[in-house]
Every structure is written in structure tokens, then in C-alpha cells.
Swiss-Prot record:
GO annotations of cellular component type: cytosol; nucleus
Main location (coarse class): cytoplasm
Keyword Translocase carried by entry: no
Pfam families: NAD_kinase, NAD_kinase_C
E.C. no: 2.7.1.-
Subcellular location: Cytoplasm; Nucleus
UniProt-listed HAMAP family: NAD_kinase
UniProt family annotation: Belongs to the NAD kinase family.
Name assigned to this protein: Uncharacterized kinase C3H5.11
UniProt-listed Gene3D superfamilies: Probable inorganic polyphosphate/atp-NAD kinase, domain 1 (3.40.50.10330), Probable inorganic polyphosphate/atp-NAD kinase, domain 2 (2.60.200.30)
A biological process term (GO) from this entry: NAD metabolic process
Length: 393
């Protein structure tokens, strides 16, 4: 097993401020950049006071967005990272099969999890990855293969909080909304995408936790939100954490016996106070997860929305709603609340929100690129029919 050496890294990685920050620093997503550039140029040149010109820009933007999903990419894949479901002997055996077949191919280096290094022979073509490596040097990997269920895909999303290499998920778990590649045909599937790849950019949310500094000080939260929409630390609040989620962020009452009071703001405008066991804010990808159980609707991943679903709401008039993902949501725990609430990010990293604290949710500039067949729509609908067992007698 060869240990990773920093000297192997590219000497000119992408900076945070570069527009390419939305794409991994690799040849795969660089080929999508011209389409995005065209969209940005049209947006800047369009005279917004002319309705017809604005209509044309909107139409062309939709056309370019569609091209991103159906544009074939000619990848140059030399480095593949494997993420597998832990504690499963069947998955472990299949992982070994994957690794030894991949390193038999020309110019392919495979990265496996460091905890599994004793399972493989030492060779320069097998290296191992750590969480820190994935976080700091995501541009090193040209492709990620996941072996497991949807939980393994979510774990991969947590590994890459910023730029994400293309993800190719193989189904070896209990749920399969995201894992539409058949593990029995892995050789054919991998060889096909090495020649031509289609990538779908799934929306992720950036979630920022803001903690109130002085618990005894009463502040005007409406005024505060309108003045600090993009701020980190403010006079009254401290920024404590930022996480990117693929499925959803959930605010719930935790161990408390009473319902939570949750104030909901849309772009700093007060919408309503939710009296419920909690609130689920989901991406279109997450519409098949907790959001579905909370009464939210299924949503195709191409639709640009934030799905807000109350969990066991006290009022029958409080129903799930869809909000454009161009907006920012603020979830505020009232300053006079009698109890705290808890938040979780894709089911992990539970954090307590005390009265006066709030959470900001907005679309992340780092999407989650999944490899798919030529017809992404068919992939999604087939996964829905298969997993929800529709049309089965």
C-alpha cells in the first residue's frame, strides 16, 4: 500500500473565489464550463428593462441548464476513489473485486479507505484516502465509485463539503433512490463512462448556524436578518458552523416533550411561526427521504426548489410548501421560547439551538455531480417505481 504524498498534488488548484469553484478541478467538469459561461454572459448583457429580452434570457438559461444534463463528457480518468458501506462482508468482497479489476487497467490509480489498507497487497496503484484528504484535495480524484445504498452516497457528500468529483453509485444497500447502477454490470458500466460520461448536478444546501451572544439582550430579529443576510459574525450573533447537505436539514424538538415554536423567514421576510414537532427543509434529491415521510411531495432533481415540510404540525392549515432555491430561508428560535430545538444535517451532526439562535439555509455553490445514463429522467422515474414498488401486483 503506497501512502499518499502531497508532492503528487496539482500545482495550480482552484481558488475559492474562482467561478470554477462550483466544479471540481478536473477535466470532466471543465468541459461543462463553456455552457455556464454562455449563460452568465447572456445574463450580464440582457437589458432587464426590456421584457422580451428578459424572456429570451430566461428561455436560453433553461436551454443551457438542460444541456448540462445531456452533454456527453470525454473524461480522462486516471484516479478513482472508492467509498463502501462499512461492516458488510458482501460489500467488502465486492470492493476487493472492484479494486483488483481497476488496477489491471492502464493508467488507473485506486484510492481506498485507510482503515482497509490491510486487506490489499502493497502496490503503487493502490493508495488510501482519509477524510482530510477528501476535504482538502478533492481535485485529486477524477471519479468516485460508491458501493452501498443511499446512505453511502450521503456519506460521500459529507466527505466533499466543497468541490465534488463525479459520483458513480452502485446499488448494494437497502435503499436505491440514488444508486441506479447495477453492481453485477460494473465492468461494462465503468468502461462506458470512461469513454463518454453524462453528469447531473444535484442541488445541495449550505446551512449556517448563528448563535446569540447575549442571552438576556432583546433584539429586533427582523431588522437583524435584513441587515446581515450574508454576514458571518455580527454584533449580536456568532457564526459557529457551516455544513453542506444533499438531502435535508431538520429542526426538531429533541428530547423536549412540548412542541417547538419555530419562526420561518424567507429572504429576511417573516412568513409564519411553525408550531410542530419540527421542520424539514429538503432539496429535490431529499424529497424521497425524511421530507416524504413528513408529508412532502416527490420532486424531480431538475426542479430548482426548497421543500419546506412541517413535522406533525399543530395547525391543519400549515402544509408543505415549495420555495425557489434562489431565496434564503432563516429558521429562528424565538427569544421568548420556553425550550430549545435541535438541528441535524442529513441525519448527522446534531446541534442544539437555544432561544435567539437561528439557522440560515441557501443553495450551495458546490453541487453534487452524479454520473447517469443518457436519459436522466428515465433513471429518476425508474428508481421511483422500483424503490416505491409502483405497478407491482
Amino acid at each position: 500500500m503506497a501512502e499518499f504524498d502531497d508532492s503528487c498534488l496539482p500545482t495550480n488548484p482552484t481558488t475559492e473565489n474562482d467561478y470554477h469553484g462550483s466544479f471540481p478541478y478536473c477535466s470532466v467538469h471543465a468541459q461543462l464550463y463553456p455552457y455556464v459561461s454562455d449563460c452568465m454572459v447572456m445574463h450580464r448583457k440582457a437589458p432587464i428593462n426590456e421584457q422580451e429580452a428578459l424572456r429570451d434570457v430566461v428561455w436560453e438559461t433553461r436551454t443551457i441548464n438542460k444541456k448540462l444534463h445531456v452533454t456527453p463528457i470525454k473524461p480522462n480518468i486516471t484516479s478513482i476513489l472508492l467509498v463502501s458501506k462499512p461492516g458488510d462482508e458482501e460489500v467488502e468482497e465486492k470492493l476487493k473485486e472492484f479494486v483488483y479489476w481497476l488496477i489491471s487497467l492502464d493508467n488507473i490509480t485506486v484510492f481506498i479507505q485507510k482503515s482497509m489498507e490491510d486487506l490489499f497487497e502493497k502496490t503503487e496503484k493502490i493508495q488510501y484516502w482519509t477524510t482530510l484528504l477528501c476535504t482538502k484535495h478533492s481535485q485529486l480524484f477524477d471519479l468516485v465509485l460508491t458501493l452501498g445504498g443511499d446512505g453511502t452516497v450521503l456519506y460521500t457528500s459529507r466527505l466533499f463539503q466543497r468541490t465534488v468529483p463525479p459520483i458513480m453509485p452502485f446499488a448494494m444497500g437497502t435503499l436505491g433512490f440514488l444508486t441506479h447502477f447495477d453492481v453485477k454490470k460494473y465492468k461494462t458500466s465503468i468502461l462506458e463512462i470512461c469513454n463518454e460520461m453524462y453528469v447531473h448536478l444535484r442541488t445541495r444546501f449550505e446551512c449556517r448556524v448563528m448563535k446569540k451572544k447575549n442571552r438576556t439582550q432583546w433584539i429586533n430579529i427582523d431588522e437583524h436578518l435584513s441587515q446581515s443576510l450574508h454576514a458571518t459574525d455580527t454584533e449580536t450573533h456568532t457564526f459557529t458552523d457551516s455544513l453542506v447537505v444533499l438531502n435535508e436539514v431538520v429542526i426538531d424538538r429533541g428530547p423536549n416533550t412540548a412542541m417547538s415554536d419555530i419562526m420561518l423567514y424567507v429572504d429576511s421576510k417573516y412568513l409564519t411561526t411553525v408550531k410542530a414537532d419540527g421542520l424539514c427543509i429538503s432539496t429535490p434529491t431529499g424529497s424521497t427521504a425524511y421530507s416524504l415521510a413528513a408529508g412532502g411531495s416527490l420532486c424531480h432533481p431538475d426542479i430548482s426548489v426548497m421543500i419546506v415540510s412541517p413535522i406533525c404540525a399543530h395547525s391543519l392549515s400549515l402544509r408543505p410548501i415549495h420555495v425557489p432555491d434562489s431565496m434564503a430561508l432563516h429558521v429562528v428560535i424565538p427569544q421568548d421560547a420556553q425550550q430549545s430545538s435541535w438541528i441535524s444535517f442529513d441525519g448527522r451532526n446534531r446541534t442544539e439551538l437555544l432561544p435567539g439562535d437561528y439557522l440560515t439555509v441557501r443553495i450551495s455553490r458546490y453541487p453534487f455531480p452524479t454520473v447517469h445514463s443518457t436519459e436522466e429522467d428515465a433513471d429518476w422515474f425508474e428508481s421511483i417505481k422500483r424503490t416505491l414498488m409502483w405497478n407491482q401486483n
